[in-house]
Amino acid sequence: MKIATIDLGKEPLFLAPMEDVTDASFRYICKEYGADMMYTEFVSADGLIRDAWKSREKLVLSDDERPVGIQIYGHIPEALLQAALMAEEARPDVIDINFGCPKNKIAKRGAGSGWLRDPEGLVDITRRLVRAVGVPVTVKTRLGWDEDSIIIGDLAEALQDAGIAALTIHGRTRS
């Protein structure tokens, strides 16, 4: 399996991004036990722009954990773009956009799975981000916002056309 030029082998083991779990120490342990590709905790675009310590700390990467991706989330397109450029400075192997987080405090603002209510905006910001950064962009999302709006088929095709290198699908809706 490959993500852009990153060869992950035949049956790669991924460490998913998990808030307050996949910090640098945990990623180190997971790499020791065979993780082929890892992601940071998700990083708030707003937090990066405000230069919040907690957000900046999540950008600290080690060559020992490669390949590694930085996952970002946010609800304002310009903030997501700026955050992606800031994340790129940390030299990740990929930048992942979180369009799947179901937490109310995230989704109700239009971030995470909240983007599933605006698929055109979701695809547009993805396309802009792919063009803006020099590393592969991946996306994590869900089947749709709810059972009445399963959009993953059309969304996956549109995201592929937007230039993403890989898509992770959480196999259920937000609700």
Label for each model-derived stretch:
Residues 2-4, 9, 18-93:
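Glycine-rich, positively charged N-terminal anion/phosphate-binding segment
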Residues 8-13, 66-69, 132-143:
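Short beta-strand/loop segments at the ligand-binding rim of alpha/beta enzyme cores
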Residues 10, 23-26, 99-101, 127:
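Low-complexity, compositionally biased segments
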Residues 13, 17, 109-112:
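A general structural-boundary detector
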Residues 14-17, 73, 145, 175:
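Short, flexible loop segments at the rims of nucleotide/cofactor-binding pockets, characterized by
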Residues 32, 78-111, 115, 119-175:
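Alpha/beta enzyme core
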